[in-house]
Design a protein with these regions (language model features):
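Penicillin-recognizing serine hydrolase domain
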Residues: 100-206, 211
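Active-site-adjacent loops and short helices of periplasmic peptidoglycan-processing enzymes
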Residues: 1-139, 145, 149-150
Length: 212
């Protein structure tokens, strides 16, 4: 594990900080960085619409049950990723930005290299893969988490939401779907404003919390 002060970057505590492990849904921190990079450059807008592909719909694990052909705004999909850790929403955004998840993942690895994340390699954009070539470390998680919350503090507006409804509009009709934050710590009496939790059977990593 590792504890890093977000604003200036000093490491306060570390143990096995450079041990490679599977990041599971913590992968989505880098996915969010690339989404906000695109927003920052102006190539993406919050009210842009994104169409769900068959590949995005097929994602298992944590999902918000997007249907093939379903259209949602970028902001709604960001909420689906940040609040509910939606794998389907992550893939939909990856495909929208780069044309394919594979190309998006290439950019994820380039971004990680640019941040000096020396022990990280991504194979997908949501963390579902069981590939041994999909790995990171506590130190690298701290580096990318710091990049996200210091460069794009707007993320805290989404990560502090406990519950919110989205509307599915498909050929089957319209229905409400409730998003519930996967980070249960935001309901505790102390303030924890941001994190990305991740868990699969072979994962022993937890993203550090950002408390105020």
């Amino acid at each position: 594990g590792i504890l890093m002060e977000a604003q200036t970057g000093p490491v306060v505590y570390q143990k096995d900080a450079d041990t490679r492990r599977s990041p599971a849904s913590i992968t989505k921190i880098m996915t969010l960085i690339l989404i906000f990079d695109a927003l920052d450059k102006g190539s993406l807008k919050m009210d842009d619409t994104v169409t769900t592909s068959a590949h995005a719909k097929s994602m298992g694990g944590s999902q918000v049950f997007l249907e093939e052909g379903e259209i949602q705004t970028v902001e709604t999909l960001i909420k689906c990723i940040v609040i509910a850790s939606g794998n389907d929403a992550s893939v939909a955004m990856a495909e929208h930005i780069c044309g394919s998840e594979q190309e998006f993942v290439r950019h994820m690895n380039e971004r990680a290299e640019g941040l000096g994340m020396k022990n990280t390699h991504f194979e997908d954009c949501c963390g579902l893969t069981e590939s041994p070539d999909h790995y990171t470390t506590a130190r690298d998680i701290a580096i990318m988490s710091r990049e996200l919350i210091t460069k794009y503090p707007k993320i805290l507006e989404y990560s502090s939401i406990w519950m919110e409804n989205i509307t599915h509009v498909t050929r089957q009709g319209t229905k409400e779907f409730g998003l519930t934050n996967t980070n249960k710590l935001i309901r505790k009496p102390f303030a924890v404003t941001s994190n990305k939790s991740g868990s699969v059977s072979y994962t022993h990593l937890r993203a550090h919390e950002t408390s105020q």
